[in-house]
Amino acid sequence: MEHKKTTTLLECFNKALSDKGIRKHLYNEVYEPHFEKIRHEEFNFLEIGILRGASVDAHLDYFPNAKIYAIDTFERKPPTQIRTCNEPDPRFKWLKADSTDPYLTAKMQEAWGDIKFDIILDDGAHWFDPMRLTFEQCSPMMSEKGKYFIEDMWPLCWMTEENCAKIWQLSKFPDKFSRAKFDEMIKSFEHMKTTHYDCRVKPEGHRIGTSDKDRNGGKPYLELAEWIGDSTIMMLENK
């Protein structure tokens, strides 16, 4: 499949109808300063959790020389219903697997060989245990200068108990989103250099550098305050 060159990462996300762009998170604001430096290089990119394949399409578009690898359980959307999985592309490979599987590293090596990834992007299960377990399985396959991104992490480090009580996901699943499990996850990153990016709606209803018109078609930001409350990214690098 030939991918038409698009100017910016935001345009790629928007064209692919990915929620990483203007449809929801605007994660391009975090990614592009890192991605543009290697945009035209040959490297390996691993994405964990692809759902309908929109972000895979965007990354194939944005990185013309990269090879994109994907892992998903495909429980919500089988690969037969994902266009990218059914159209041959020499730059895209996928594997049906659970990213928390203790044998995942071996399965990836069996499928793809002794490969190293310069970018690993975890967009899988968005609670703390699977984020930690996925990191433990996939980080050994990160290159020395690679970057590991974890999306949609509820930032309990920035939230009070009162904040958490107002978020239905955190109230409904207290075990999945406990502070103890958050702390356990953070502890597993201690040997890494970490940067935590906050892409959430601000309390006053605005995000820095993004206008209402660009973000939400002119609708008030406060309408979005809860459902993008997990819009943070943690970037991990080798020290």
Regions found by a protein language model. Name each.
Residues 1-121, 125-150, 154-239:
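A short alpha-helical cap/connector motif
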